[in-house]
Amino acid sequence: MSQLRLLPSRLGVQAARLLAAHDVPVFGWRSRSSGPPATFPSSKGGGGSSYMEEMYFAWLENPQSVHKSWDSFFREASEEAFSGSAQPRPPSVVHESRSAVSSRTKTSKLVEDHLAVQSLIRAYQIRGHHVAQLDPLGILDADLDSFVPSDLITTIDKLAFYDLQEADLDKEFQLPTTTFIGGSENTLSLREIIRRLENTYCQHIGLEFMFINDVEQCQWIRQKFETPGVMQFSSEEKRTLLARLVRSMRFEDFLARKWSSEKRFGLEGCEVMIPALKTIIDKSSEMGIENVILGMPHRGRLNVLANVIRKDLEQIFCQFDPKLEAADEGSGDVKYHLGMYHERINRVTNRNITLSLVANPSHLEAVDPVVQGKTKAEQFYRGDAQGKKVMSILVHGDAAFAGQGVVYETFHLSDLPSYTTNGTVHVVVNNQIGFTTDPRMARSSPYPTDVARVVNAPIFHVNADDPEAVIYVCSVAAEWRNTFNKDVVVDLVCYRRRGHNEMDEPMFTQPLMYKQIHRQVPVLKKYADKLIAEGTVTLQEFEEEIAKYDRICEEAYGRSKDKKILHIKHWLDSPWPGFFNVDGEPKSMTCPATGIPEDMLTHIGSVASSVPLEDFKIHTGLSRILRGRADMTKNRTVDWALAEYMAFGSLLKEGIHVRLSGQDVERGTFSHRHHVLHDQEVDRRTCVPMNHLWPDQAPYTVCNSSLSEYGVLGFELGYAMASPNALVLWEAQFGDFHNTAQCIIDQFISTGQAKWVRHNGIVLLLPHGMEGMGPEHSSARPERFLQMSNDDSDAYPAFTKDFEVSQLYDCNWIVVNCSTPANYFHVLRRQILLPFRKPLIIFTPKSLLRHPEAKSSFDQMVSGTSFQRVIPEDGAAARAPEQVQRLIFCTGKVYYDLVKERSSQDLEEKVAITRLEQISPFPFDLIKQEAEKYPGAELAWCQEEHKNMGYYDYISPRFMTILRRARPIWYVGRDPAAAPATGNRNTHLVSLKKFLDTAFNLQAFEGKTF
């Protein structure tokens, strides 16, 4: 028996040629009806021999359990393996007569030939795309490599690779179950096999899918592309495709004629993208999709707005008129960044469909996670857990798709439970150039689409000058997404007829490419000639179609001349019906009190300190935390975590969906939140008590994110776009790390309303505080947020009745640094109770989470209470303000350091401390009151951050404005520095003591000039 166990390795000697380089599908031992066949991987990893062992041991048990060809193969091989051996042959091996030797040799040859053919088929399935004719210009291989895989039969002599000869070309071979090239036939000649493989894998479509580790999915793709005759189109479908190409090309031609010197980033060279997108939408609509959310860069955007979203042409043409005055607030944006929302009938399916094109900046690919977040939210509000009603399409450029890291971050959100959108169709406009950069200098991978392999997304490369191939690929892509709820990539290999923009000269850097482009016949003419030649349309019908669309454009151009005002709100990508009045203004300019009834506080506190599920064992450390919450609730106090719990819980009671996302937010970076409880005895059994507060509450979502800031913050921003009736929060692990999402903050959050008239109520929770933890765990960079705040430091405001709310409405975002749990509770609730939405930036504490003094009473949170923009001094100094020698203004955690130091120096009557809770927009009215309350006091601003950071540069000119420059505001804090904080604990404490000494040295500023 030991000899038998060695036999597979001896068999491998005979089969080595067939197994050495490829995965070889199983030959004919399972019927087509029995499901996908087994396969075994390359022998380099040992998988080939493992498979052969399985087959061999199955044969040992029962020779009839394997195909007869394997039976013959093993019989012959076992005889050879034991030839010359003194040991007896195994009883399971039947002796054959000498006359059968010739038959055995023929059988062995037959098996080897069939295995060779299967290897050949698999070679085309894996590597055929390398030699596909993808470049419309015929210059480059799309994979940047002219190497032709040795196992593809590009010439007759390549047959020798498989030990086949030219004489074998007309032999019939049994087809394996891993191919559909035979259609209804089970055998084909080798010549026909190669021809069909060439037609499927090496023409205008290149398929990358064999890396997918799911046999069913691979079989699905093979069937869609290999089955003979699958790419057949009716005359009506061809005419529709031609009409869409006409619209795509003539739109660009019209803009070029009317505004030849304007930048528009036209689609010339990839006009087929318009029918491609429309096909994806048509097919998806047919399968039940009702809402499609698109994201794309500038290239071809106006064409998509006109011919896919169906924006009124006159409104597009108005964007080219420099004399029109913008009617809406804000600064606006260039025309090729604008978004759009439109509900219409899909004429192909006669079904309603909503199309949204999300506005985006010039920062390529930044819109990707935003689109995904908006899509996820729309699915959530519709109860569309499987993504059968709402989907997303992302259009990319080849250079950006390969070069921008946010693409990778977004892909890795695609299958996370709280972030999946159940599949996205990605369309890459691969014009084989990035501005002036050659692809060889722009990426290290063969294709720009290789990043999609990380999520097992199939990649369909297609020559954009073959419109029918493009349309078929897009139809399959839509079906794939609907069938498997996974991402798919369509790579439109095309060219860029003009420079990067219409004013750019590409011949400087790509002379040979552009010489070929100038000779290139436009795809519309190519396809029209084809249809005319085959009789699908006549020349007259084609010319009439062109004239018809030209007339539509001219008429719209005429109407655009009558426009007097440019309305940015016509380009809103995420309207909130019913939230604003008909003019898009808030329905009021007031905000109700944010406190809640005490019985609600008590109820939420009770749930927060318990486990709603039976037989659920929690960690003993967590039990102590819950007991602590119960004690606080009993004593009518809250700490930071409990205040947050009560804010969230009360909003859920009011029907407001709350979503908290970020790294480690379920537990909390500082182990303070614990919104998800884990059973200590049952793996993966969890409980979210917040979802057990009320029978009819809104759902609460708390989800740990991937270790990404850029992608995840963009996702949450998009999520917040979908509805104003949700509190969407993103928490950084430490505030320092938000700068890896700086693009989202700069291009979307701080400027989104000004550019795109888009309100957004996203909340950023940024842990911040100087505690000796080093330069990367200390600062959320408040100075940067304040620098981007748009309130005027030099304008003395008019203190009207609605000043507080009007000031919030006029700002671009709200920046706060709360020093009490109660104020944190109120600012979260105010975010929803305001009659409009603004981004909210909160610098949250770390050490204050457990600080014994950082607690609030229920009295500060009950009905009738509200957020305090400024918390004034309420101690001895406030009772005798005329005796106060110094009034210190501060914000955040440093307040507790100041109070402790003041107490140690017994200066409660001489030094008053006022906390600035809302930093921007600046509370001019309350600061004025506080300063006037202490007329004889020096004014000082104290911060724990370095002087060139923190808040001083922001507050100083505003103090000067409100005080009419009558009194200086002195600086107390750390000296200027390059790094936000020291990494040395001792240095931290020394610098802390130094500025605290200055704060309470009442002679510190004598003799100094401001």
Curated annotation (Swiss-Prot):
Expressed in the brain and the liver. Ca(2+) binds at H130, D143, D145. Changing D491V: In YOBELN; uncertain significance. Residues 1-73 form a transit peptide. Keywords: Calcium, Disease variant, Glycolysis, Intellectual disability, Magnesium, Metal-binding, Mitochondrion, Oxidoreductase, Thiamine pyrophosphate, Transit peptide. Residues 81-100 are annotated as: Disordered. GO terms for molecular function: metal ion binding; oxoglutarate dehydrogenase (succinyl-transferring) activity; thiamine pyrophosphate binding. Its main location: mitochondrion. Changing R673Q: In YOBELN; uncertain significance. GO terms for cellular component: mitochondrial matrix; mitochondrion; oxoglutarate dehydrogenase complex. InterPro entries: 2-oxogl_dehyd_N, 2oxoglutarate_DH_E1, DH_E1, KGD_C_sf, ODO-1/KGD_C, THDP-binding, Transketolase-like_Pyr-bd. Its cofactor is thiamine diphosphate; Mg(2+). Changing P852A: In YOBELN; uncertain significance. Thiamine diphosphate binds at R299, D398, N431, I433, Q663. GO terms for biological process: 2-oxoglutarate metabolic process; glycolytic process; tricarboxylic acid cycle. Induction: Post-transcriptionally repressed by microRNA miR-214 in cancer cells. Mg(2+) binds at D398, N431, I433. It comes from the Eukaryota. CDD domains: TPP_E1_OGDC_like. Its EC number is 1.2.4.2. It is linked to Yoon-Bellen neurodevelopmental syndrome: An autosomal recessive disorder characterized by global developmental delay, and variably impaired intellectual development. Additional variable features may include hypotonia, spasticity, ataxia, hearing loss, visual problems, seizures, and non-specific anomalies on brain imaging. Belongs to the alpha-ketoglutarate dehydrogenase family. The OGDHC complex comprises multiple copies of three catalytic enzyme components, the 2-oxoglutarate dehydrogenase (OGDH/E1), the dihydrolipoamide dehydrogenase (DLST/E2) and the dihydrolipoamide dehydrogenase (DLD/E3). OGDHL/E1-like isoenzyme may replace OGDH in the OGDHC complex in the brain. The presence of either ODGH/E1 or ODGHL/E1-like isoenzyme in the complex may depend on its tissular distribution. This is 2-oxoglutarate dehydrogenase-like, mitochondrial.
